Design a protein with these regions (language model features):
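Acidic, surface-exposed loops and disordered segments
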Residues: 1-209
Length: 209
C-alpha cells in the first residue's frame, strides 16, 4: 500500500477485534517508520507507552471514561510529548549534523543559541507547544504507517490526563496529547461512508487569510 492510499483509506475505528494480538515485531516496525517523522531542529520530543496487557488496558479504560475500544484494541499507545527533549537530545542532534556535514563545527554555538531563543525554558508555554506540535506529527505518521501494515487505529482525546500519568508512571512535566488505539477491524463490521469533509475552498486561502 502506498502512502496516498494509506491516507485515503485510514479511518478512526471504534470496533476492534478483541483478543487478537499484534506481534511486537510489527509494532516495532510501525514505530520505526513513525520515528522518521520531521521535528523542529530534529529534536524528536516524543515518547510512547505501549499498553498491551489486558489488566493494564482495563486501568487505561477507566482513565479514558470507560470507552470500550481501549480494552478491545490489541494495543493502546500513550503519546507523550516531552518539553525537556531539547536538553535531552540537542547534543546528539548537533553531533549528527556535524558528522554528516549539515553544520560546520564553528556553527554549533549559534545553533544552540537559536534553539534556546526559539523554545525558551523547559516549563514555558513555547516549549510545551513545541513538544505537542512535533509529537502530533509523529502520531499522524504512526497512524499512516499502521494502515500500511494492515492495522487500524483511532486517535483519542477523551481521557483524564492526570489519571493516565498516575497509573502509567508518566512524569508530571510531560504532556499527553492523545492516546492511539491500534488493532484489527472486528469481523462482520461494515464501516459507514466517511463523514462530512469541508471543501478545500472553505479553508484554503492564497497569499493572505
Amino acid at each position: 500500500m502506498d502512502a496516498i492510499q494509506a491516507i485515503k483509506e485510514r479511518r478512526s475505528i471504534n470496533f476492534f477485534e478483541t483478543g487478537k494480538d499484534i506481534p511486537n515485531d510489527k509494532l516495532k516496525e510501525m514505530l520505526e517508520i513513525a520515528n522518521l517523522s520531521p521535528s523542529s531542529f530534529n529534536l524528536q520530543p516524543w515518547k510512547v507507552v505501549v499498553v498491551k496487557d489486558p489488566e493494564r488496558k482495563k486501568i487505561l479504560k477507566q482513565c479514558a471514561f470507560n470507552q470500550p475500544k481501549v480494552e478491545e484494541a490489541s494495543a493502546v499507545l500513550i503519546m507523550v510529548a516531552d518539553p525537556g527533549a531539547m536538553e535531552e537530545n540537542i547534543d546528539r542532534m548537533l553531533d549528527s549534523w556535524q558528522e554528516l556535514g549539515y553544520m560546520k563545527p564553528e556553527m554549533r554555538e549559534t545553533y544552540e543559541g537559536m534553539t534556546n531563543n526559539l523554545y525558551s525554558e523547559p516549563n514555558s508555554l513555547k516549549r510545551k507547544i513545541f513538544a505537542v506540535k512535533n509529537t502530533s506529527l509523529f502520531a499522524m505518521n504512526l497512524m499512516i504507517a499502521a494502515k500500511g501494515l494492515g492495522l487500524e487505529t483511532h486517535p483519542m482525546d477523551g481521557f483524564d490526563e492526570e489519571c493516565v500519568k498516575k497509573e502509567f508512571n508518566i512524569p508530571e512535566d510531560k504532556i499527553i496529547p492523545m492516546l492511539i488505539a491500534v488493532g484489527y477491524l472486528r469481523q462482520g463490521i461494515t464501516l459507514l461512508p466517511r463523514a462530512f469533509r469541508r471543501s478545500i475552498d472553505e479553508f484554503v486561502k492564497f497569499e493572505k487569510y
